[in-house]
Each structure stands twice: as structure tokens, then as C-alpha cells.
Amino acid sequence: DRFYNGDPENDVETREYFYIGDYSSKVTDWNKYPAAMGVREFYGGDLQGVIDKLDYLQDLGVEVLYFNPLFVSPSNHKYDIQDYDYIDPHFGKIVEDGGELLSPGEKSNKKATKYQKRTTSFANLEASNELFIKLVEELHRRGMKIILDGVFNHCGSFNKWMDRECIYERKKGYAPGAYISRESPYHDYFRFFSDEEKDWPYNGKYDGWWGHDTLPKLNYEESVKLENYILNMGRKWVSPPYNVDGWRLDVAADLGRSNEYNHQFWKKFREVVKNANPDAIILAEHYGDPREWLGGDEWDTVMNYDAFMEPITWFLTGMEKHSDEMREELRGNADNFTRAMTYHMANMMVPSLLTSMNELSNHDHSRFLTRTNHMVGRVAELGPEAANEFVNPAVMREAVAFQMTWIGAPTVYYGDEAGVCGFT
């Protein structure tokens, strides 16, 4: 959303819908700092913007694009997926528009008819998938690859399976969501704390990931249909005509309600993905020892927090990766750095190390350049301007030298190449 706006016609509008206590907001000043709670702010970046800037990315030396989620979702981060089958038209193409924005003071998305039209129209959804195909084809023509973000532990409250916001209620081509009706075909996709006829319609008593009602936890163990659907999504996007080159798996160890089921699912996921595209990579977001998933029958590799981002950050800045803590005794401590790297690298076999995602910054943590200012705190406490103060570009360059030469796949968070700063 904050990369490049190639198609202003698909921009999210102010008051297009209501989410987490406020309206969606269209930002017109690209120099404006994002709000501390900026999940509803949209700068207009889209897939056409990426296509327009592929020469720049290729000249920079980029070989693989890893996207945060692109599927239909109400937030700008899109880890609250509304529809796994389609690219969000606000990133793709809006060919069929209409409906009304919410009036000031109106908070019910039942009346967000413009948002409903944009995100449920099959014309918009199919056109957005077609634009995505065009992007992938152009990347492959250039010898580049693409990785998608798979958010399969939970979905969003806007999701057509739950439909807490009544976006899909009585829409042609869509079945009732589990929030709407106990007879919904998606009822078993979720765990309801109160599951009697009297709790419907509009049953909001369901399990959310970490208690967030905007992130309903998916209930795999009680729904073979759900499991098969998500496995099919894993297969679909790495197969023609989409031909994606791999998946990054969000909070992968959290999926399911037991460790036993988690391993069972990822074995099945690997089988369907590799059968469809043997060269597709499967890498997981994971904190801690990943060995039990890296036996060759589940994940290929991980986002390398333990054996790259954290040791490098402590060694060069003395900061915790969220900027939550400063430990002066770890800055420049070569013995601690060597021990940490040696210990955590030993938890991965060589193939996993060679392909591990070595990042300095990403969407979950403060920017590395900001960590060089040694300020402890987050944007809500310190403000966005403080992220730029007292930074040390020389330390950033030193970190990049490590990143580009260390075993693994150097992965640059967009903006780092231009010296962008920012707190968590």
C-alpha cells in the first residue's frame, strides 16, 4: 500500500467502511507519517504500481518479491483475510464500481455499499486475479520470482465464512456466514463458545486468535472441509495460471489446536504444494527452535530471526528487534554474537540455512536504521518523528554488509534501501 500508486481508480476511499473503531481513510500526502493505529489508512499502492516499478527493483538487484498478503481484506496489512480466492480489488482492478460511502456517524457496514460492491463483485475479483497473473508473467519473463503470504491460522471477521460485518449477507453467489446463521455451511470452520439456536442470528461468541474478534481462529480439527479448502488454496496459487514460486506461512506453528495436528497439516500442505510445483519454496514465520518442522517433510526453511536478525541487532546496536529494550552489554559483544549464531545455526540443516530469510527489518519490527538510535519504545509512545533522530547510517551499512554476505537469502524490507526509518 505504501510502495507506489499505479492506479488511482482502485484507491480505498475515506469512509468506505468502518473497522476497529474508525473509518477507512485515504491518505493524499505521501509524506504524512502513518498513524500509530494506521491499519485503516491507505496510501494507494497497488499491483500496477509494482509493475510500473519493476525496472527499478530489477536494477536494485532484486530477484524475488515477497508480498505481504494480497487477498481481499479490510486492513492495509491484510493479515485479516476476507476471501482467500481473490486478490483485493483495491490492489488489483475495480471495473465495476458504485454504492455509497458511509455517512458521518454511521458505523454499520451493512450500509457500506461501495465497499460491498468493490469487494464482492465477481467482475472486480476476476479482473484483480487477471492483473496478478500479468504481474507474475512479467516477473518470470525477467527471471524474477514471487512468494505469497499464507495466513492460514486465522482469517478476518469480514471473511465470507464468518461475515461478522454482514458484507455478504443475502449477496448473490454467497452462502450465509457462520456469524449470520447456525445453518451456515461454514459453521464448523470456527469454534463458538455458545452454540445453541438462540445464539443466532449474529453470534459474536467465537474464538479469536489471541482473543481478537477481528481474527477468528480457524477450527481445522472439526472441519475436514476447511482443511481441504485451505490445502486447495496452497495448491491453487502455485499452479497455472498463477504460478507463484512459494509461500511464506504466517504464525505457522500456531495453526490448529495441538502440536500433533499442526505437523499433520503441514505435511499435507507440503505434499499438495510440491506436487503442484516441485520448485515452490515453503518458508515459515517462526520464533524459536524450528527443528521439528525442518525434517524435509514440512517446511523448507524459516524467517531467520534466531540465527540472523536478533544476533545481528544485538551485536551492532544493543537493541531488541522491536526497540523494546536496550542492552549495552550485548553491543559489540563478539563472544555473545558468535555463540548465538553457532547455537541457532546448528538448529537447521544446510539446505534450510541456505534458503533462510535473512532480514534486518520487516513489517513486525522497528526498522534496523531506527534501532541504531538506541531509543527504547514504540511509535505510540515516542511518535513517528523520533524514529529518524540520531540514527547511524554507518552501522546500517555494516549490517547490510553482513546481510549480503552471510549464509542465507538476504531479504530487504522495501524502504530500507532508501533509508526509511520507523518504530514498531
Describe each model-derived feature in a short phrase:
Residues D1, L65-F67, I146-L148, W247, ...:
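Hydrophobic faces of well-ordered beta-strands that scaffold small-molecule active sites
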Residues D1-K145, N153-C155, K160, G208-N228:
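N-terminal structural segment of carbohydrate-active enzymes
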Residues R2, F71, D88-F91, F152, ...:
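Short, flexible loop/turn elements at secondary-structure junctions
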Residues L57, F67, Y84, L139, ...:
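Conserved, mostly hydrophobic/aromatic
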Residues V62, P241-V244, G408-A409:
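A structural motif
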Residues V136, H140-M144, N153-H154, F158-K198, ...:
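Active-site-proximal helices and loops of the catalytic beta/alpha 8
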Residues H212-P216, D250-L255, S352-E389:
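Active-site clefts of carbohydrate-active enzymes
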Residues G295-D306, E359-R378, M404-T424:
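Aromatic/acidic polysaccharide-binding cleft in carbohydrate-active enzymes
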